């Protein structure tokens, strides 16, 4: 039996695999970024690993170095909600997610850069914003976002979340001020500062929350049997809930009691007792005051065997007004969470505390009997390279400074020598002039 030749079917068969291939390429582009090495200065190559460091403001990523480029693979998964998905949320939930975008403004205080746009923005299950693409200031794109540009893009995102007919790019490129929308959108556009915009969004969110709590209730008609089982279930749930709340209450009380005990030990300058009391507390859940108490106590006990001058310098840096991440670093270091300590130190771009964390990490690897020889060598090389990069950079800065000072001293010596020669010549000339005058006097 001979099959009839159908050009339409043949074309369809050809298009299907092509469409699937194109879809796979599109997903790859979403999950991956490639940066040519030609776009980066060679002396900055060692900084590229910062693009895979964990940060609360960015999607986790993995950096791979190829011959001519760096590839970044993003871990985009079901826990990440794309910006476009929140458009279908209820108004109060939508406002909550949008209000949290203000947190990304904190990135401008770090060395990282990012793109604030719909296709670059995701949210965690808790509604916290995370950006996909990140760069490094003066190293790799994207360029830093100014306060004015951040505010403009923030407004455009808010409007697009409520008005799907609007184009984000068109609003950002100049149509924002010309946009005529709802009273809500007008208020968003009129906000002159980030604080005013977030205050307005928070006000709207609170109104929506109040409206939902006062005007909405879910009622379901059920038969007697269903009602009975629901009642039994609710009773059981109530008992479990009371038990849980009791556990939570006593757990919180115990937690607060330990915090207070640590504070009392700190006042008595019993720094070792402070460390023992806070030993297994989660630093990320502590307030700034508790972190300060731990950080100062840890440095005072000098667990790292620091020299006196170095110790005093660190104590001067640890104050109640210090950066919370800086204080958290000392708790992570003291509790042996060295990877977290290294991440925080790198994020803060502080060479001194980064070196300290790396040295501790190398000692941990050295003393870890569970590691095979190959794994120990691999890990040692990894962290040794990071430490050496910092030392080389510091040595370069130190050498350049010494060279500059040497050149200044040399120039100063040459100038002084020239002045002495000039003074000597002036004295010799003055002596010659004097002798000529005396000779002239004798001949008269």
From Swiss-Prot:
Residues 366-444 are annotated as: Disordered. Residues 1-229 are cytoplasmic. Residues 251-444 are extracellular. The keyword Cell membrane applies. It is a single-pass membrane protein. NCBIfam families: T7_EssB. This is Type VII secretion system protein EssB. It comes from Staphylococcus aureus (strain MRSA252).
């Amino acid at each position: 039996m001979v099959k009839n030749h159908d050009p339409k079917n043949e074309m369809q068969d050809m298009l299907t695999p092509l469409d699937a291939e194109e879809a796979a390429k599109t997903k790859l582009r979403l999950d991956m970024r490639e940066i040519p090495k030609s776009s980066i200065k060679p002396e900055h190559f060692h900084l590229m690993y910062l693009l895979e460091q964990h940060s609360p403001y960015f999607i986790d990523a993995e950096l791979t170095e190829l011959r001519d480029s760096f590839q970044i693979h993003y871990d985009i998964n079901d826990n990440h909600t794309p910006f476009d998905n929140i458009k279908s949320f209820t108004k109060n939930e939508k406002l909550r997610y949008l209000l949290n975008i203000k947190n990304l403004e904190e990135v401008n205080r770090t060395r990282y850069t990012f793109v604030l746009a719909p296709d670059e923005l995701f949210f965690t299950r808790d509604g916290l914003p995370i950006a996909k693409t990140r760069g490094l200031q003066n190293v790799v794109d994207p360029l830093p976002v100014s306060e004015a540009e951040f505010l403009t893009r923030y407004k455009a995102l808010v409007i697009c979340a409520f008005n799907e007919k609007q184009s984000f790019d068109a609003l950002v490129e100049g149509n924002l001020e010309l946009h005529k929308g709802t009273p809500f959108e007008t208020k968003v556009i009129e906000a002159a500062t980030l604080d005013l915009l977030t205050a307005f969004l928070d006000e709207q969110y609170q109104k929506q929350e109040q409206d939902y709590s006062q005007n909405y209730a879910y009622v379901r008609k059920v038969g007697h049997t269903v009602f009975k089982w629901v009642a039994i279930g609710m009773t059981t749930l109530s008992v479990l809930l009371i038990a849980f709340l009791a556990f939570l209450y006593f757990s919180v009380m115990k937690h607060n009691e330990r915090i207070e005990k640590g504070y009392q030990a700190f006042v008595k300058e019993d720094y070792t007792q402070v460390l023992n009391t806070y030993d297994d507390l989660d630093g990320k859940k502590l307030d700034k005051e508790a972190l300060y108490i731990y950080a100062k106590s840890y440095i005072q006990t000098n667990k790292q065997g620091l020299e006196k001058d170095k110790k005093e310098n660190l104590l001067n840096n640890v104050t109640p007004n210090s950066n919370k991440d800086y204080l958290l670093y000392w708790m992570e270091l003291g509790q042996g969470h060295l990877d977290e300590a290294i991440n925080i130190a790198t994020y803060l771009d502080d060479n001194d505390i980064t070196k300290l964390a790396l040295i501790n990490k190398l000692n941990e690897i050295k003393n870890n009997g569970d590691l095979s020889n190959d794994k120990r060598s691999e890990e040692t090389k990894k962290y040794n390279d990071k430490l050496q990069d910092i030392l080389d950079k510091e040595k370069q800065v130190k050498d350049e400074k010494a060279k500059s000072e040497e050149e200044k001293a040399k120039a100063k010596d040459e100038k002084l020598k020239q002045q002495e020669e000039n003074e000597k010549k002036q004295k010799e000339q003055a002596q010659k002039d004097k002798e000529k005058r005396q000779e002239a006097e004798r001949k008269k």
